[in-house]
C-alpha cells in the first residue's frame, strides 16, 4: 500500500486510538503519510460525513482502530456511498457481528489477529463441546478458556483461591 491514499480512523478509545496511533507512527516512519486521520465516537451510527471526507480525499485504504460495531457500520456506509476502499483493522473486528453489520461489503477486509486456535488438533474436543451447546467459539473464546484452565490448575495445585498464591504458583 506504499503509494495508496490511506485513511487512519479510530473510535477515540484507548484500544482504538492506541492502535490507530501506532499504525500511523509505523506508516510515517516508513515514509507513508495518511491523507485522513480522524476519530469518531463510539455509539455513532451515521458516518456519511466521514465517508464523504474519505471519498473527497480519494482514499483507497481505510485503517480502522476500533471495534466491530462501528467498523461494520463504516464499511457498510462506505459501500452504500460507492467508496470501495480496502478496509483494514486489528482484532477488534474479530466477530461474526462485523460481517452481519457490514454486509457483503466486508468481503476483502484485511485484519490482524493471532493464529486461530480452533484449527489446532488439541482444541478439537473443546471446540466440539462449545458447539454442542450452540456456542461458536470465535475470536478470543479459546484463549480465554485456556487462561481459565491455567488459573484452575494453579488453584487446584495450591489448594487455594487466594489470588496471590494462585499467581505465585
Write out the residue ranges for each language-model feature.
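Extracytosolic ligand-binding ectodomains
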Residues: 1-169
Amino acid at each position: 500500500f506504499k503509494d495508496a491514499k490511506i485513511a487512519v480512523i479510530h473510535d477515540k478509545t484507548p484500544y482504538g486510538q492506541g492502535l490507530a496511533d501506532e499504525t500511523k507512527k509505523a506508516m510515517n516512519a516508513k515514509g507513508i503519510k495518511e491523507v485522513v486521520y480522524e476519530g469518531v465516537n463510539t455509539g455513532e451510527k451515521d458516518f456519511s460525513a466521514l465517508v464523504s471526507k474519505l471519498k473527497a480525499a480519494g482514499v483507497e485504504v481505510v485503517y480502522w482502530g476500533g471495534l466491530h460495531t462501528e467498523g461494520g457500520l463504516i464499511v457498510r456506509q462506505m459501500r452504500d456511498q460507492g467508496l470501495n476502499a480496502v478496509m483494514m483493522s486489528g482484532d477488534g473486528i474479530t466477530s461474526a457481528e462485523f460481517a452481519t453489520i457490514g454486509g457483503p461489503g466486508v468481503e476483502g477486509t484485511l485484519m490482524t489477529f493471532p493464529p486461530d486456535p480452533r484449527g489446532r488438533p488439541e482444541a478439537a474436543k473443546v471446540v466440539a463441546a462449545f458447539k454442542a451447546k450452540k456456542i461458536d467459539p470465535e475470536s478470543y473464546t479459546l484463549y480465554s478458556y485456556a487462561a481459565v484452565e491455567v488459573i484452575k490448575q494453579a488453584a487446584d495445585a495450591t489448594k487455594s483461591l487466594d489470588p496471590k498464591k494462585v499467581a505465585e504458583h
